[in-house]
Every structure is written in C-alpha cells, then in structure tokens.
Amino acid sequence: MSKAAVLGAGSWGTAFAKVLADAGTDVTMWARRAEVAESIVSRHENADYLPGIALPPSLTATDDARAALDGADIVVLAVPSQSLRDNLQVWSPMIPEDATLLSLAKGIETGTLMRMSQVIIQVTGADPGRVAVLSGPNLAREIAIGQPAATVVACTDSTRALELQKASATGYFRPYTNSDVIGCEIGGACKNVIALACGMASGIGLGENTIASIITRGLAEIIRLGVALGAKPATLAGLAGVGDLVATCTSPLSRNRSFGERLGQGGSIESAQAATHGQVAEGVKSCSSVRALAASYDVEMPLTDAVHRVCHEGVVVQDAIGQLLGRRTKPE
C-alpha cells in the first residue's frame, strides 16, 4: 500500500486526500491550523473548506509536517501556487529521499515566472522524474461527494505516473497518465485567468454567446503559450486543457468564475475576496505572471491582458471588453 502525505487542507487538498483514501492509499494530511487537523481526525470533516462532507475514518491529519511526511512515498503539494516556494523551503529537509512529489497547485510563480514543477525542482533539488502534476476538470466539492470525474497525472517518469494513477483510481475518479508536464501546467494555470474573464462577462449580464467566445478564444491563447513552451497541442485539447477550462469557466462552484462575477458587478478585489470566504482567486495573482510569461515568448494573449488590466490597473470591465472588440480583425 502506498503512503501519502497531503500537505495543505484546503478544499481541493481535502477532496484529493479523500480520493486517495478511498483508493486504498494510507493518507495523512497536514493542516496549517491545529483546529482543522483536529476536526478531520475527531469529526471526519473539514468544516472550514468542505462543510458537510464526511471524510473516511482512515484519513488522518496533523499540524506537524514532519509527522505527516514520515515514511511517505507520495507527497502531495496542495497549497496555493504563490505560497508553494515558502512552504517547500520549510518542508524540503523532511521529504523522504525518493518520494514522488505531486503538485495540485495551478499557477505561474510571480517574479520568477516558473511553473510549479520548476519551483519544486529548484527548491528541493529533486530529479525532474520525481515531480508530477495533476490537472483536469476537478471541482473539489463534486469530487468529494463522489460524482464521476477524470483527471490527468503528468510525469516524465512513466513508472511513477502509473504508481500515482493506481494510488488515486476509484469508482468515481479516473486518472489518465501523460508525460506532458508542461502542457498540463500551462492548461491549469491559464484556465483560472480565462474563468475570471467569463465571470466578469456574466457579472455585467452578458450571455452564452459571449461566454462561449471567451472560452474558445481563451483556449487559443492557452495553446499558443503552451506550444511556445514545448507543450503538446493534444494535451491542451484533453482533460488538462479543454476539460479543466470548461469546468472552471462555467461552474458556480468555480472560485475564479465567482470572483470574476463580483468584479463584473462592480465589486472591488477586496469585496470579491470577502464573498469567496476570504480567499483570493488564483487567477487574480496568475494573470500578471501568465501575461509576463507570454510577453517573454512573444505570445499574444489579449484576454489575459484584459483580465490583468481589470484586476491590477483599474480598467472597468465594459471598457476592457470594448478594447478587445476594437482590436484589428484577422483570420481565426
């Protein structure tokens, strides 16, 4: 039996820990706050992030990272993208030497413009073959209640990818393996930005034609950037690209879409944050780093640029849309 440490007890970290436990994997979660760990252990519920969801009795938790990591052969990194580096610097000396490191974080690091796998490799010194990412249409609450979903486990080491697949396959969660780590990470990072755009459009009362257009042109941006970085277009046409994009752009469970709706309705970043339980959507932070990464590769991403300008330069949503529609016409 595999032993997994899930570092991070937010909604997705908790849901994926449940998946692992349901698949027969021995799982210990690390929670930053002792009361969250205590709730998981004693009440089998993470009331802060997945209220009302019963967690398996076999799933344990602690606020001691060293205890969680002890003997783990799978280390799941389930903290937000912009805090991954700081956390890893603390955890790295405790991580077992040959453990597979699986990133659930979706984003591009601000400043360095690194993908999450690159951050992991740089901080831990791990061989790239030990680092994997998981990405797909995986809204935490739907998975936590056992609704069927699929995902992609990407790793350049096919043996480790298969081990992760086995450790997380259940009757409701179907992981596919892939070797295209770059494609999975770019799809996961960029979809949050496009979901913000969809939310903004919905927030000002625009309809399905607009949303469909944003999703489709957003996918074109994602593919352009992914290919420039070495991703395979087929990856971005799959679960880690189109699948994740559609789920995040259309579901009311999507924090990024909900955050964008608040902005479209005229709310500030602060009021949108308050409406999403105090959490800033990943796309708000990632839009600037994705934009900068695209610029460094001379890749045009007008939707991403528009989201950045709304979130960080004070541009009104209606004006951003007008500027997009006023661009020079060209072939698809």
UniProtKB/Swiss-Prot annotation:
NADPH binds at S11, W12, R32, R33, K106, A140, R255, V280, E282. InterPro entries: 6-PGluconate_DH-like_C_sf (IPR008927), 6PGD_dom2 (IPR013328), G3P_DH_NAD-dep (IPR006168), G3P_DH_NAD-dep_C (IPR006109), G3P_DH_NAD-dep_N (IPR011128), NAD(P)-bd_dom_sf (IPR036291). The active site is at K191 (proton acceptor). Gene3D superfamilies: N-(1-d-carboxylethyl)-l-norvaline Dehydrogenase, domain 2, NAD(P)-binding Rossmann-like Domain. Keywords: Cytoplasm, Lipid biosynthesis, Lipid metabolism, NAD, NADP, Nucleotide-binding, Oxidoreductase, Phospholipid biosynthesis, Phospholipid metabolism. The keyword Glycosyltransferase does not apply. Pathway: Membrane lipid metabolism; glycerophospholipid metabolism. GO terms for biological process: carbohydrate metabolic process; glycerol-3-phosphate biosynthetic process; glycerol-3-phosphate catabolic process; glycerophospholipid metabolic process; phospholipid biosynthetic process. This is Glycerol-3-phosphate dehydrogenase [NAD(P)+] 2. Belongs to the NAD-dependent glycerol-3-phosphate dehydrogenase family. Its main location: cytoplasm.
